[in-house]
């Protein structure tokens, strides 16, 4: 079925507008908002689904609501951050006539405070995800720039051993310092595996189902 003439005419106008270079910076900000919303939903929904049904108690309705709420918050925050970051970058470029490396840091710095500055579980997870990658990247950058010598042997096995040693030590003796979702995961792995009553909660279920 062909589209109505009015709709086809509108699409022609919209597509012509999207191709105009003079509006590219503003339109890039809008598409960044769109991409942030989509990406946030795509990565949060599966994570929330798994974590909620593995570790959260409550009715099916409560679990579904928790999944939707977490997905919405992540999607909305990421969309706002991309919008803010790209908008500030465009403004900096317009004011100064070109871009500088400091522009990226300043725009993201302000966006981070405005969007991800609230201390909650979702923002904590996002920040910790980024922090690990930032530290890796800075280590590689320091080697590339010659600030530190390139290792003569692969340091990854030692790093792995230290990370796993520390996280299990923290879990066993200073658990409250770990992020809640990590506590839940490690409890499932290392403590729930110590308890069973029969074959049902040894192989089929993690914990015995309550009898009716």
From Swiss-Prot:
CC terms in the record's Gene Ontology section: cytosol; peroxisomal membrane; peroxisome
Subunit structure as annotated in this protein's UniProt entry: Interacts with PEX19.
Classification of source organism: Eukaryota, Metazoa, Chordata, Craniata, Vertebrata
Record-stated family: Belongs to the peroxisomal membrane protein PXMP2/4 family.
Compartment annotation: Peroxisome membrane
Example GO BP: ether lipid metabolic process
Further facts: Hypermethylation-mediated silencing of PXMP4 may be involved in prostate carcinogenesis. PXMP4 undergoes hypermethylation and silencing during the transition of prostate adenocarcinoma cells from androgen dependence to androgen independence.
Domain of life the protein comes from: Eukaryota
Keyword annotations of the record: Glycoprotein, Membrane, Peroxisome, Transmembrane, Transmembrane helix
Main location: membrane
Organism the protein comes from: Homo sapiens
Tissue: Expressed in normal prostate epithelial cells, and androgen-sensitive prostate adenocarcinoma cells. Not expressed in androgen-insensitive prostate adenocarcinoma cells.
Residues carrying a glycan: 57, 206
Membrane topology per record: Multi-pass membrane protein
PANTHER family: PEROXISOMAL MEMBRANE PROTEIN 4
Record protein name field: Peroxisomal membrane protein 4
Membrane-spanning ranges: 97-117, 153-173
């Amino acid at each position: 079925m062909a589209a109505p003439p009015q709709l086809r005419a509108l699409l022609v106008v919209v597509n012509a507008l999207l191709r105009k270079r003079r509006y590219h910076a503003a339109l890039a900000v809008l598409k960044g908002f769109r991409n942030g919303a989509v990406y946030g939903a795509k990565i949060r929904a599966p994570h929330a689904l798994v974590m909620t049904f593995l570790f959260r108690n409550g009715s099916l309705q409560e679990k579904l609501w928790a999944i939707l709420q977490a997905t919405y918050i992540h999607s909305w925050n990421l969309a706002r951050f991309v919008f803010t970051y790209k908008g500030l970058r465009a403004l900096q470029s317009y004011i100064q006539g070109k871009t500088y490396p400091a522009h990226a840091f300043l725009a993201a710095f302000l966006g981070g405070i405005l969007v991800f500055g609230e201390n909650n579980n979702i923002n904590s997870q996002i920040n910790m995800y980024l922090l690990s990658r930032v530290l890796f990247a800075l280590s590689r950058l320091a080697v590339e720039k010659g600030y530190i010598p390139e290792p003569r042997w692969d340091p990854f096995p030692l790093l792995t051993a230290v990370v796993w040693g520390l996280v299990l030590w923290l879990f066993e003796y200073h658990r409250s310092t770990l992020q809640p979702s990590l506590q839940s995961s490690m409890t499932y792995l290392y403590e729930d595996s110590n308890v069973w009553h029969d074959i049902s909660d040894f192989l089929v279920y993690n914990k015995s189902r309550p009898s009716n």
